[in-house]
């Protein structure tokens, strides 16, 4: 009787230990799987941060076309891709309609659907590729009858037509650049734009490229747009400054660039132009840099 009980106890203990080991192995396998996924994403040697890597500008590419090329993009060493605006354009069929949006929301446009953008972001994650979306926030389409309903009120617009004197900073930030200029100083406008960024983030977007950034004022110009839309979003930001935020005033231009760099990185267009010129002329100038030599930290520049 005692031996029978002992054998039974031994069998029960063996079964228990086997189950315990199996459970442990399952736990280990489950814990290893995410590491393997991360390892697979890092097989291409891509940068963890957008600022540190190369961005492929997929200008006017459809979302599904980008998704189909992700492996090739990763193998080519691009750590991020940049799409054209996800906002709904005032028309279709030509790239520039996307830069005349009807509002601040993701909708169906020439690039694809909201679901297709989300699918692109999810697939890009598996390769370790970040997704940057171009955002137009300086203006909307000229036909106000079709723009976002809650922005139709005149108080949300600067209503300053006429040409722009680019040595006049106020005109740069308040006058139309062919489309109606949004009142970036208005707190409601700022929140509408920020909510759009959070919508993009919810779809898996990692970064924002700001179109016409130099046409949007700074805190020193009584405008809290930039701190409002960038803080707390968890997104990387860079913008379009082009040559200078103001012409014919180097001291003011450098001060403004320093202020922009508190909130966003920006393109060093002068540097890129100098590089192109060096290739064309087969000559390298003694100083090929631009913004970096004017006091802007190199980790805030995009080339």
Regions found by a protein language model. Give the residues of each.
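Aromatic- and acidic-residue-enriched carbohydrate-binding clefts of CAZyme catalytic domains
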Residues: 40, 49-53, 89-122, 150-183
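Sec-dependent signal peptide hydrophobic core
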Residues: 12-20
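Sec-dependent signal peptide cleavage junction
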Residues: 23-42
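N-terminal carbohydrate-binding/catalytic regions of secreted carbohydrate-active enzymes
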Residues: 54-110, 130, 184
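N-terminal secretory signal peptides that target proteins for export/translocation
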Residues: 1-9
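The substrate-binding groove and active-site-proximal loops of carbohydrate-active enzymes
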Residues: 52-61, 99-112, 175-190, 206-219, ...
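Active-site-proximal helices and loops of the catalytic beta/alpha 8
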Residues: 41-52, 68-71, 85, 92-99, ...
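Glycine-rich, aromatic-flanked loop segments that form ligand/cofactor-binding clefts
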Residues: 76-86, 116-142, 146-163
């Amino acid at each position: 009787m005692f031996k029978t009980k002992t054998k039974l106890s031994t069998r029960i203990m063996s079964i228990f230990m086997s189950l315990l080991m199996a459970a442990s192995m399952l736990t280990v396998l489950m814990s290893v799987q995410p590491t393997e996924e991360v390892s697979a994403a890092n097989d291409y040697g891509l940068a963890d941060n957008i600022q540190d890597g190369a961005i492929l500008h997929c200008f006017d590419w459809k979302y599904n076309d980008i998704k189909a090329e992700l492996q090739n993009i990763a193998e080519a060493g691009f750590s991020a891709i940049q799409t054209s605006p996800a906002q709904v354009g005032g028309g279709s069929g030509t790239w520039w309609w996307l830069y005349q949006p009807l509002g601040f929301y993701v909708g169906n446009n020439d690039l694809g659907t909201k679901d297709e953008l989300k699918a692109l972001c999810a697939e890009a994650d598996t390769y370790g590729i970040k997704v940057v979306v171009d955002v137009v926030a300086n203006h909307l389409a000229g036909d106000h009858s079709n723009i976002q309903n809650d922005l139709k009120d005149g108080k949300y617009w600067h209503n300053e037509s006429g040409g722009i004197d680019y040595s006049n900073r106020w005109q740069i930030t308040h006058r139309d650049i062919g489309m109606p200029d949004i009142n970036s100083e208005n707190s409601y406008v700022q929140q509408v734009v920020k909510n759009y960024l959070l919508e993009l983030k919810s779809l898996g977007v990692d970064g924002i490229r700001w179109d016409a950034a130099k046409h949007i004022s700074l805190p020193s110009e009584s405008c809290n747009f930039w701190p409002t839309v960038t803080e707390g979003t968890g997104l990387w930001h860079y913008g379009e400054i082009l040559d200078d935020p103001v012409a014919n005033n180097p001291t003011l231009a450098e001060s403004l660039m320093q202020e922009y760099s508190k909130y966003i990185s920006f393109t060093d267009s002068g540097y890129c132009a100098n590089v192109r010129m060096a290739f064309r002329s087969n000559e390298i100038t003694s100083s090929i840099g631009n913004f970096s030599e004017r006091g802007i930290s190199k980790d805030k520049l995009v080339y």
